[in-house]
Structure formats: C-alpha cells, structure tokens
Amino acid sequence: MMQEKKSNTKVIRNEKFGGERPLFATHDLRLENVTITDGESGIKQCQNIEAYNCKFYGKYPWWHVDGAKIDNCYFALGSRSAIWYTNDLVMTNSRIDGPKFFREMKNLTLENVEITDADETFWKVDGIRIKNVKLHGGTYPFMFSQNIFVDGLESDSKYVFQYCKNVEVHNAKILTKDSFWECENVTIYDSTLDGEYLAWHSKNVRLVNCHLAGEQLLCYTEDLVLENCTIDPMCDRMFEYSTVEADIRGHIENIKNPTSGHIVADSIGSITIDENVREPNNCVIEVRNKRYEL
C-alpha cells in the first residue's frame, strides 16, 4: 500500500519486491516492513530513501543512493555487495550477514550494527563514524578508507584498517594480526589490540591507555607515540626500525633495534641491539630511574 505524506515523502508498507530494479530512480521514499526478495539492484540510482524494519535478500540492493536512513533492518547472506557508491547514509540497529558491504562511499554513519561476514567491508570510504559496531569474520575491512571515527568496536576480522588515513578509535577490542598497516595519522584510545605485526610501515601513530598483545608489534613505524600503555608479557621484538616515544606501564619483555626516540617502562626483560640496527641509533631506553643510551 502506498500513500502520500504531507512532506511529499511517499510511504510503502508491507510490500515485497523482486526481480531487477523494482525501485529504480525513486526518491523521497520511506519503506516500512518491506522485503526485497531474490533479484538484483532493488534500490538503485535513488535519492532520500528511508528503510525501517525491512529485509533484503537479493544481490546489490542499495547502489548509487544519495541520502539514506536504514533502521532495524536485516541484510541476508545473499545480499552481497549491498551498499556501494552511496553517500550520506545512516544505519542503526541493524544486522548484516552478507559480505563486501560499504564501498566507494562518502559520509557513512553506523550505530548498533552487527556484521557477521565483514569480508572486504568499508573499502574506499571517505568519512566513517561508527558507534557500538561488531565485526566478525572476513578479511581487510576498512581498506583504503579515510577520515574514520570509532567509538565502540569489537572485531575478530583479519587485517583490519590497512592503507587508511586519519583514524581515531575509542573503546575498541580488536583481535587480528596485521592491523593498521600502511596507515597515516592514527590515534587509538582505551582499546585492546591483540595480534601480531601491529601498525607496521605506518606513520604518525599514537596509542593512549591501550593494552597490546602479539609478536613483533609496532615495527617500521615512523613517529610512533605510546602513552600509559600496557604490554602483554608474551610480546617480543617490539619497535624494530621504528622512531618511537613510549611510556609503558608495567613490563615489556623485549625491545629490538629501535631507530631513535625514547622508551620508558617499569621493567624490561631484554634489549636487542645488533649489527643490523639503523642510524641514527640513538634511542634512549629507561627502566624507570635506570637509563640505557644506545
């Protein structure tokens, strides 16, 4: 049933659409309890679309849409590559089971969203705001994206945040290896980062009140800052070939060949400086009140 609102926004309630492009080029449309069944490109080349309590099953259901709100909706496994080339989208209180969501976009906001297959999700997005989002499975979420703000993220997806710029993260629990590779301008607060090879080959990385776990963390990193961070006792070979300013609370097991900077911790298991260290080789390392100059 379709009806006209005073605002000239059309409302569609309790309908099902299938086939190819059933709502192509529509605008100023509100969908309530609508199901997009098997088919392709259910909503495409549209403007100002709202969806509430809707379900999406077909492929590519939401492409080339400018201005959208999605609330309390479900995207099934078959709705792969669902939301691409879409700008100014707000999604809340929804669940996504399909892979390869959110690509080539600008201004994306998610709150209270769970993505159960985060494979190749959030690629080439400029302007992401996330609050209370869960990512499971898949590889390389957030790749090539920039201007990202996160407050509340749980992720066990592999290789998150690679080739990203201008990233601010709060209250995250990230379990993966190779996260934050080849990134620029990253600040992470009050988070747990668990996985090998954190932030290799990145620039301007700042970690504040974070807990780190994994092997060979923070290597080949330029302009690295750690403030009031803790390190899992199993971590080793940290800071190799990095320029670093680090204030570590508690113990760090092994530091290897930092290039320059200043590292202080309450205790240090061992320091490895060998013939492969790079110039200028002038990092100052302290066990509070006991100093080593390399």
Q: Where are the regions that the model predicts?
A:
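Long, distal/terminal scaffolding or interaction modules
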Residues: 1-294
